[in-house]
């Protein structure tokens, strides 16, 4: 599939913007394969995004045209099992600069041409995985667990553009119970999310000197479906 950004945008020197992919003239490319057998689905995919963060730079009050590009690859595997009473789904992503998908990450500046101000970049990589398990028909208990780890960059960087680039790891767990009858769904859900924040290690783009912040959330729902 060839994809263009509209509502969900990549991060860059000017925050979230469509101009990075517009100036790149290269759409996002995704290729995947799925295997299905009865209630089981297993698949994998690869995604490429190529962005142009800037087209000009200013050095000593002079404006220079620059040719910048950052291209990154991301990989994912996924599975889903569905039976009369069971639903099990899981996914794991090795991501690189996936801010347009609401993921944490981005890219950093690895070098600057002192004459023209042209910059070269190194993408931030992270690993994220989640699993969701649901059982039952009328009464449905369910659990969800997700984890994300910042893997840093391949090169030394001086500055980062992205989302949550000061987060080292993120952990989220959810337990819920729903009561399901025709046209109605009643439920309660508890979620605990913890994030470990810190400072950028410029030598590898990782986050160091971390401390954790946790959030507790309790949600009750009543849905009428027609």
Which stretches of residues belong to each language-model region?
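Alpha-helix capping and helix-loop boundary segments enriched in small/acidic/polar residues
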Residues: 20-21, 67, 210
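Residue-level signature of outer-membrane beta-barrel architecture
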Residues: 35-37, 80-83, 135-137, 179-181, ...
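A glycine-biased, small/acidic residue-tolerant capping/turn segment at secondary-structure junctions
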Residues: 154-156, 196-206, 210
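Hydrophobic, lipid-facing positions within transmembrane beta-strands of outer-membrane proteins
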Residues: 27-31, 73-77, 127-131, 171-175, ...
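Aromatic- and glycine-enriched pocket-lining scaffold segments that form the walls
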Residues: 1-62
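C-terminal closing repeat unit and adjoining cap/tail of repeat-based domains
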Residues: 173-198, 211
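Detector for outer-membrane/organellar transmembrane beta-barrel domains
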Residues: 39-167
